[in-house]
């Protein structure tokens, strides 16, 4: 799908201020993303999610992340994620490739 190394750079620039990916990583403003792929929304243990996030009821995967990362507030109205989104599909694909790799270790 995307390029893991390019995705890592995007994560560092746009996501790492609020999220960690490593197993056992701490929650920041946003939840630790380890184990993200295949998990339902609002399920990272120990993180305080909005009801909107908990009630969305989708499972994170390539397709759901592709849509969410384009415009988080449109995909989950009421989310507390303040990130505006990534408009370029190729950049989202790179980020998702990195997340698939980094959050599964």
UniProtKB/Swiss-Prot annotation:
Assigned GO CC terms: mitochondrial intermembrane space
Primary site of residence: mitochondrion
Disulfide bridges in this chain: none
Keywords in alphabetical order: Acetylation, Electron transport, Heme, Iron, Metal-binding, Mitochondrion, Respiratory chain, Transport
Listed GO MF terms: electron transfer activity; heme binding; metal ion binding
Residue positions binding heme c: 15, 18-19, 81
Keyword Transcription regulation: no
Subcellular localization: Mitochondrion intermembrane space
N-acetylglycine modification, residue list: 2
PTM: Binds 1 heme c group covalently per subunit.
Top-level taxon: Eukaryota
Family named by the database record: Belongs to the cytochrome c family.
Described purpose of this protein according to its UniProt entry: Electron carrier protein. The oxidized form of the cytochrome c heme group can accept an electron from the heme group of the cytochrome c1 subunit of cytochrome reductase. Cytochrome c then transfers this electron to the cytochrome oxidase complex, the final protein carrier in the mitochondrial electron-transport chain.
Protein's name in the database: Cytochrome c
